[in-house]
Amino acid sequence: MNVQLNHTIVAAHDKKASAQFLADILGLEPSPPFGPFIPVQIPNGVTLDYMETDGDITPQHYAFLVSEDDFDTIFSRIQDAGLTYWADPYHHRSGEINHNDGGRGVYFQDPGGHYLEIITRPYGSGVG
C-alpha cells in the first residue's frame, strides 16, 4: 500500500502573514493562492494550506525533519526574529535545543499560536 500525506489545512487569523512566516523561517516561498488557501509546499511535496478563520484557533503541532546544515540556518532565523524557543513540547526548557536520538531539535510558535518544530533525526531513530 502506498499512502502519503498530501496536504493539511492550517487555521489562521491572517493566512497571508502566517504562510509568509512559515515560508520565511524555512527558507521557502508561499505558493499562489488556491481557492480559500495560501499553500506553503515543503520539498517532499506536502502542502500546508493556510485558511483564514474568525473563530478561535486550536493550536496544532507541525514538525519538520531537516538536515544539520538546514537546522543551523533555520535556527539562526528563529534567533534573528527574536522568537522564544524551547527544547521540549511542554515549554519547560526555554532558550535551549534538545539532542534527542543524537540529533537536534527545537520548538517555537507561529503568529497563530501553532507549535512548530525542527528536528534533525526522527524521534525513536537513534540514541537518546
Residue ranges and their predicted role:
Residues 1-16, 61-62, 122-128:
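N-terminal beta-strand motif that seeds the catalytic metal site of vicinal oxygen chelate
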Residues 2, 9-48, 52-55:
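Core segments of cupin and vicinal oxygen chelate
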Residues 2-4, 55-59, 99-100:
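Short glycine-enriched loop/turn motifs at secondary-structure junctions
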Residues 6, 36, 60, 102-104:
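Residue-level marker for the onset of beta-strands and adjacent loop->beta junctions
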Residues 18, 22, 62, 78:
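Hydrophobic pocket/interface hotspot
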Residues 22, 75, 120:
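Short, flexible helix/strand-to-coil boundary loops that buttress conserved ligand/catalytic motifs
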Residues 48-51, 107, 116-119:
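Conserved beta-strand in the GNAT
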Residues 64-111, 115, 123-127:
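Vicinal oxygen chelate
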